[in-house]
């Protein structure tokens, strides 16, 4: 079913805005509106409200992967060839939107002057696919030293709050989650006691690893009936405010078998770096440059095909599983995180 979005004007953004402006506006437009909360988009218009293009969360993230700065023009993150409907043609517009649900979940409505006058939104988009979550919480946390001697790493507190509670909060906010699996090993009883004290919208099942199976091996312990469902795998030692709905939608619309969430990491080389040609001729000396790289953020969406690549209780880490999928010609994409993200790897991170 499709509905007209009465407050569509909050989705309009002018063509002099930046990508950063678009990110903020997209995060703001869903507040207090049940329809748009889970389907955020922007309509790029000129000063007379003529449609220039459309922008989704995925468009913004793809622009980041292309190397665009957040201060770049929003046009760099815009679909400049949008599909649109026409004024007073509700039946045709509804049919058009239904025919393109494999691409998008909304349809700008224009008048004869190509000005935006409305927006049609589907509340039955194919993107709304349910998903199960596997929370990886069985590690020893050795890098934290004595802090994890009697406490599992996910229960270590940062700013007065257990690390795992941050992850559980974003999982609980995701309206697509139907079941949560939690992989445990080290001090599992303490972990279960803490998690069981919380309230969730979905059932929880604990998977106990008799011996550590690596960062991906517990996928082999999941119920066989999940062979038709995607699995979201997330580490229990992250601090992030990512909206998991956006990640899952990105995975589905990209038609990936695996989507790896990545975060930008910057490190400084403490020396002058020499640039030179293939013949050995000097080109440039750069003093202590900053290097930016995308790193795996400990969050993945995997299709059932990845579970089929595992044998029961196989010991394997996630990089090896992802590379195995690559060798089997599975489609693997990346999802850049621009939201808050950090990994608790040392006492200094607390």
Predicted regions and their residues:
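The conserved cystathionine-beta-synthase
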Residues: 11-39, 45-46, 64, 84-104, ...
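Short beta->alpha transition motifs characteristic of CBS
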Residues: 37-39, 43, 50-65, 102-104, ...
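A short, conserved acidic/glycine-rich loop-to-beta-strand motif
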Residues: 254-264
């Amino acid at each position: 079913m499709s509905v007209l979005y009465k407050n569509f004007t909050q989705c309009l953004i002018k063509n002099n805005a930046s990508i950063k402006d678009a990110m903020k506006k997209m995060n703001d437009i869903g507040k207090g509106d049940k329809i748009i909360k889970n389907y955020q988009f922007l309509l790029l218009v000129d000063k007379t409200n003529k449609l220039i293009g459309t922008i989704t969360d995925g468009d913004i993230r793809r622009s980041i992967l292309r190397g665009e700065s957040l201060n770049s023009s929003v046009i760099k993150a815009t679909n400049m060839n949008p599909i649109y409907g026409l004024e007073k043609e509700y039946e045709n517009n509804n049919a058009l939107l239904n025919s393109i649900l494999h691409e998008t979940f909304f349809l700008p409505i224009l008048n004869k002057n190509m000005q935006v006058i409305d927006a049609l939104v589907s509340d039955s988009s194919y993107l709304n696919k349910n998903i199960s979550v596997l929370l990886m919480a069985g590690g020893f946390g050795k890098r934290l030293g004595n802090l994890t001697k009697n406490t599992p790493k996910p229960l270590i507190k940062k700013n007065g709050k257990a690390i795992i509670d941050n992850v559980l909060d974003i999982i609980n906010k995701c309206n697509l989650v139907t079941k949560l699996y939690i992989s445990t090993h080290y001090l599992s009883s303490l972990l279960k006691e803490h998690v069981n004290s919380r309230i969730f919208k979905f059932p929880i099942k604990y998977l106990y690893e008799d011996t550590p199976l690596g960062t991906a091996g517990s996928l082999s312990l999941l119920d066989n009936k999940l062979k038709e469902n995607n699995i979201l795998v997330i580490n229990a030692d992250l601090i992030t405010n990512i909206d998991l709905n956006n990640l899952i939608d990105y995975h589905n619309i990209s038609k990936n078998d695996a989507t790896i969430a990545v975060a930008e990491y910057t490190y400084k080389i403490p020396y002058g770096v020499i640039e030179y040609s293939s013949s050995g001729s000097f080109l440039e000396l750069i003093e202590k440059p900053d290097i930016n790289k995308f790193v795996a953020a400990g969050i993945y969406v995997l299709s059932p095909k990845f579970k089929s690549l595992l044998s029961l209780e196989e010991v394997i880490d996630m990089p090896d599983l992802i590379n195995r999928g690559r060798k089997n010609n599975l489609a693997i994409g990346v999802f850049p995180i621009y939201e808050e993200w950090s990994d608790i790897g040392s006492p200094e991170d607390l």
